[in-house]
């Protein structure tokens, strides 16, 4: 399904040294409306909000669970279709949208479906990836249902997919075995850097405090091979020797970002075990760290946060979108109230902000 919008999302990469940079973080209330138009029957609610530059003038936005169907006056119909797993939106340089999912318009399903085990529902939530030579290299996390309620799910594994960027058809997939060897949830941040590909993930302890680990690989014949794992001092071929990256002083979200900004490596995350409303950044000179320069970039302020039983999580950076010395970011919001998801649709739509790059890297 393709929905046309009358706007343009051109990625601006101007020289910030020639402009006066507004030091204030700018809230962009219109951006999610561009990606989630209320009418047209497409995706009108979701989380994840992970983007990848497709390198052809288009960007891919990946959603976790999502709602389909019109939203009128911030309300959605009780029979609105809800998809567990993943759906994608592609937006081109002219602002035209293409929504990717399986199934039918009347019964939409996740775009990349997981094989079922016949015991409990199994699905993929999106990780991250990159594009090279017309191929999207994408990591997806597989989960299954283990109980009732919003958090009745369990991580199973990480799979590495390759897709044709033009058709978005799957070329192949394989299990990323390291994730089950060392319990690191790899693939939630992927960084191409100086001829190698760095794949990051978190490992949480029994209290939910998460540390960041990194592996790196070579891209040979359009496929990631020869993975090694950072042990805190050097790279090892044994995934079980992986150790946390030094210098990250906050518990990092399950989904987070590592991007290159102004020749610095920047990690951005919400505080997983502290105040989840706080969005932090750290910088390093190398992908494996050590990281430093902790910055509180933004504090989430939502009117009705308590009244609407809201939650916020998984801040994302969209480095392909730059303007006036700022980079586009977002954070996800949700509610513990299933009723409110229909009565107030905006409770399940990402919030976009423009953050001064200097605020991160200086």
Located regions from the model:
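C-terminal motif of bacterial Sec signal peptides marking the signal peptidase cleavage site
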Residues: 8-11
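Bacterial signal peptide processing site
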Residues: 13-15
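Extended, non-transmembrane interaction/recognition domains
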Residues: 182-186, 196-201
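Short alpha-helical segments and helix-capping/turn motifs at coil-helix boundaries
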Residues: 35-38, 44-49, 122-126, 184-185, ...
């Amino acid at each position: 399904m393709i929905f046309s919008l009358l706007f343009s999302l051109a990625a601006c990469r101007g020289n910030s040294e020639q402009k006066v940079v507004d030091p204030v973080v700018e809230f962009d209330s219109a951006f999610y409306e561009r990606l989630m138009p209320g009418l047209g029957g497409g995706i009108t609610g979701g989380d994840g909000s992970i983007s990848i530059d497709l390198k052809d003038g288009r960007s891919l936005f990946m959603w976790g669970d999502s709602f389909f169907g019109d939203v009128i006056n911030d309300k959605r119909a009780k029979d609105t279709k809800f998809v567990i797993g993943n759906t994608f939106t592609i937006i081109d340089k002219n602002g035209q949208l293409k929504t990717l999912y399986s199934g039918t318009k009347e019964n939409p399903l996740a775009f990349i479906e997981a094989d079922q085990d016949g015991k409990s529902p199994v699905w993929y939530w999106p990780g991250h990836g990159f594009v090279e030579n017309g191929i999207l290299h994408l990591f997806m996390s597989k989960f299954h249902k283990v109980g009732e309620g919003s958090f009745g799910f369990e991580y199973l594994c990480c799979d590495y997919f390759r897709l044709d960027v033009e058709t978005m058809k799957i070329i192949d997939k394989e299990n990323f075995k390291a994730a089950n060897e060392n319990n690191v949830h790899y693939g939630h941040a992927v960084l191409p850097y100086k001829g190698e590909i760095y794949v990051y993930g978190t490992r949480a302890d029994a209290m939910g405090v998460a540390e960041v680990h990194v592996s790196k690989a070579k891209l040979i014949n359009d496929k990631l091979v020869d993975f090694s794992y950072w042990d805190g001092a050097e790279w090892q071929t044994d995934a079980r020797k992986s150790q946390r990256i030094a210098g990250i002083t906050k518990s990092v979200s399950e989904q987070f970002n590592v991007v290159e900004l102004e020749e610095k490596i920047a990690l951005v995350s919400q505080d997983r075990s502290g105040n989840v409303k706080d969005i932090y950044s750290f910088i390093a000179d190398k992908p494996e760290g050590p990281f430093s320069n902790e910055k509180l970039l933004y504090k989430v302020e939502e009117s009705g946060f308590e009244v609407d039983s809201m939650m916020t999580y998984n801040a994302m950076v969209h480095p392909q979108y730059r303007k006036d010395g700022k980079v586009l970011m977002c954070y996800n919001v949700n509610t513990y109230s299933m009723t409110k998801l229909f009565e107030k649709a905006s409770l399940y739509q990402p919030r976009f902000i423009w953050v001064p790059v200097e605020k991160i890297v200086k």
